[in-house]
Amino acid sequence: VERRHALAKLADERGLLILEDDAYIDLRFEGEKKPTMFSLSQKGSVLLFGTLSKTIAAGLRLGWCAGPEDVIAVLSRGRTDSLRNTYTSALAEWFIQTGKHAEHISQLRGIYSAKCEQMLAALEREMPAGTTWTKPKGGFFIWVTLPEGVDAVEMIATARENLVDYIPGPSFYSDGSGRRSLRLSFSNVSAEEIDAGISRLAATVKSALPVATPTD
């Protein structure tokens, strides 16, 4: 929260515009919801973007933007809308206005919380020493850091042969670092797939561990 305050304040002071992508804002399943930078800015220095793709269906391709009226007015004049399905858009509007979307989100939080806990338990049970991971309070993902000497980029081909997949760490770094890291998703997998997948991942990591050199 302190970093959000600092960034919003900096944007206000310097006349900057922050684009805040908060796709998982409604999927926090532990602790209180954090304030957005949009809500913290005193001078309208933040545009807040959200989406229905994480809470209803990715295929809807529907989202929203909140910001200062003058900025939204400019964005509205430049918009194009040639591919939107008006029928599904109307259904999404009905889903939200009737309160069913809020009920649905509440159910999703319970589902994703249970899946997250199961994946965390499987990581604790299966992964070799030296592996660490985050314990998320919302969203879809767990960030894993592999033991020293294991490269997530080099390992991915073997992992896929073992029927498990992930996104290597360098995909999230502008400088290409993070090769010991990877991102796992628990959103679209069953309980059985979580246990089987983490078991396969652990076996893959163990096979990639550096071989210890014998000493006299």
Per-range role (PLM):
Residues 68-69, 97, 145-147, 187-189:
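Residue-level recognition of strand-loop junctions within catalytic nucleotide-signaling folds
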Residues 150-155, 192-196:
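Short, conserved charged micro-motifs
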Residues 1-17, 24-55:
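Active-site pre-lysine segment of PLP-dependent enzymes
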Residues 110-120, 131-145, 155:
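Conserved glycine-rich beta-strand-loop-beta hairpin in the small C-terminal domain of fold type I
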Residues 42-110:
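Conserved core segment of the aminotransferase class I/II
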Residues 161, 176-216:
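PLP-dependent enzyme catalytic core of the Aspartate aminotransferase-like
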